[in-house]
């Protein structure tokens, strides 16, 4: 394999194995070249990735030395992607009866999910995250996107237990918007003691559901790494949680004029 061919293949390999430690000896054998050649390739890839804002390439010395690619986006690109999605949310045909917002097409488009996943993963890439948690059903594609970039598993909390998940742990929680007591469940095999859990969801009003998932994290003797939501909806009153990050925020839904006031979420407050 010629060097230019190897560089293309190597670059693709790194991108498809984010946050994984790759052994230099194994890479040398795979490409049938000396470790010094692999190191030279990495210098070139590292420079291009950092200049283009693709991610960070780190090398680790020693006989068992390796390389790790950590994808990230610049704050400017994160802001740009959020504004692109905000424009979609401002479309007047998104307003549903009762003041709800139609999100299925946005959360069903892979390119949008990739953007949402990148923004959330960028916010938490320097923190220890072992597992991503969400609740069925619309939070699942977001959780999968974030988990893929962080290279960690994701677990799904359900409101109704599934027989295929075996023994479960259940908690009751108070819905923040309707003040009803509801139930959520998670398989006992999903989490291990001491894991750092990042909670993600598609939409938040009173934060009752997220508060319930937070209770589940503590019931499993795990640690909360953070809470991130795609869209923060308008809510009159006090939310059940105040420590969270949101990509976008809906300040007001004007049903009469069929307009939605969409602003950037607090994830951009310090950027």
UniProtKB/Swiss-Prot annotation:
Alphabetical GO biological process terms: negative regulation of DNA-templated transcription; negative regulation of purine nucleobase metabolic process
Keyword DNA-binding: yes
Annotated knockout phenotype: Disruption of the gene leads to a purine auxotrophic phenotype.
Segments of this protein annotated with the region DNA binding domain: 1-71
Activity regulation description: Binds to DNA with both high and low 5-phosphoribosyl 1-pyrophosphate (PRPP) concentrations, but activation is detected only with high PRPP concentrations.
Domain of life: Bacteria
Disulfide bonds: none
SUPFAM superfamilies, A to Z: PRTase-like (SSF53271), Winged helix' DNA-binding domain (SSF46785)
Induction info: Autoregulated.
Record keyword DNA-binding present: yes
GO molecular function (one): DNA binding
Any single Pfam family the record assigns to this protein: Pribosyltran
Keywords tagged on the record: Activator, DNA-binding, Transcription, Transcription regulation
Signal peptide (UniProt feature, chain positions): none
Region: Effector binding domain, residue numbers: 72-271
Task performed by this protein: DNA-binding transcriptional activator that controls the expression of a number of genes involved in the synthesis, metabolism and transport of purines. The PurR regulon also includes genes involved in nucleotide metabolism, C1 compound metabolism, phosphonate transport, pyrophosphatase activity, (p)ppGpp metabolism and translation-related functions. Acts by binding directly to specific DNA sequences, named PurBoxes, in the upstream control regions of affected genes. Required for growth in the absence of exogenous purines.
Similarity comment: Belongs to the purine/pyrimidine phosphoribosyltransferase family. PurR subfamily.
Quaternary state and interactors: Homodimer.
Domain notes from UniProt: Contains an N-terminal DNA-binding winged helix-turn-helix domain and a C-terminal regulatory domain (or effector binding domain) resembling phosphoribosyltransferase (PRT) domain. However, the PRT domain lacks enzymatic activity and serves a purely regulatory role by binding effector molecules.
Name the record gives this protein: Purine biosynthesis transcriptional activator PurR
Organism: Lactococcus lactis subsp. cremoris (strain MG1363)
Gene: purR
